């Protein structure tokens, strides 16, 4: 994993290419990412994905984007972000990036590329049916990947079959009548110098499927108690992932409340 340079609130830091910005901030000792809108209470990283309620930042590099969870930004060289308290600023320059759309008909659509989704894709692909499997994470595997555990190579290889379309960094945003799904694929935000001029930044997928398999998994929620938004309070799944996958320790001493294995991991 190569080291890249990024800027946060005007200060230059270093991190590992491809890791979430939240992991890089924690590795550099940044506990307070932003402040609340009205009372200016300090807030840090709580989660790992779109469930992140506190660590919202503004991207100033590239096409620019406001109100993005730091947990969903892949680190690339030259990334420029700043903390965000309240409403973000829309970019005032013209967005020169390309955006496109595509329409697909498929036998089976699988939403979620965790262990369950991968096994479903393998079984359906072996039957000869056409498959689209999409997932909003940076890589397949779900919780198994989060804990840096190995995934059976046969499952990964099943995604390479001719009748399988595999889409990572793709979020299904709507499920409508007659098995019609709309999804957004983020195609270039995780790239830097490798971007081709004709490559679109995002692609909207309009998918009609004969069958849909929901393998979306679940995410944790913060317990309700006073001051539960203070820096240092984190979901056990997030803390375990930062430690095992990104080698970032989130605390030395602490209290762990858990109802599953993540608290012990």
Positions of predicted regions on the chain:
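Residues forming the flavin
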Residues: 1-265
């Amino acid at each position: 994993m190569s080291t890249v340079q990024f800027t946060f609130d005007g200060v230059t830091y270093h991190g590992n290419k491809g890791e979430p910005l939240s992991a890089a901030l924690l590795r550099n000792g940044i506990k307070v990412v932003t402040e609340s809108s009205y009372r200016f209470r300090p807030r840090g990283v709580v989660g790992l994905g779109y469930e992140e309620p506190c660590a919202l930042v503004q991207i100033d590099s590239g096409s620019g984007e406001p109100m993005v969870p730091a947990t969903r930004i892949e680190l690339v060289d030259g990334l420029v972000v700043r903390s965000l308290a309240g409403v973000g600023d829309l970019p005032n320059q013209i967005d020169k990036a390309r955006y496109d759309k595509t329409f697909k008909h498929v036998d089976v659509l699988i939403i979620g590329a965790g262990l369950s989704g991968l096994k479903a894709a393998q079984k359906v692909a072996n039957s000869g049916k056409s498959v689209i499997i999409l997932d909003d994470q940076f890589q397949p595997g779900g919780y198994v990947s989060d804990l840096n555990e190995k995934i059976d190579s046969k499952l990964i290889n099943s995604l390479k079959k001719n009748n399988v379309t595999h889409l990572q960094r793709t979020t299904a945003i709507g499920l409508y009548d007659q098995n019609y799904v709309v999804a957004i694929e983020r195609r270039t935000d995780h790239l830097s110098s490798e971007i081709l001029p004709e490559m679109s930044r995002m692609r909207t997928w309009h998918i009609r499927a004969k069958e849909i398999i929901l393998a979306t998994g679940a995410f944790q929620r913060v317990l309700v108690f006073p001051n539960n938004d203070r820096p240092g309070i984190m979901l056990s799944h997030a803390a375990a992932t930062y430690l095992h996958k990104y080698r970032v320790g989130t605390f030395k001493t602490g209290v762990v409340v858990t109802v599953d294995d993540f608290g012990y991991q």
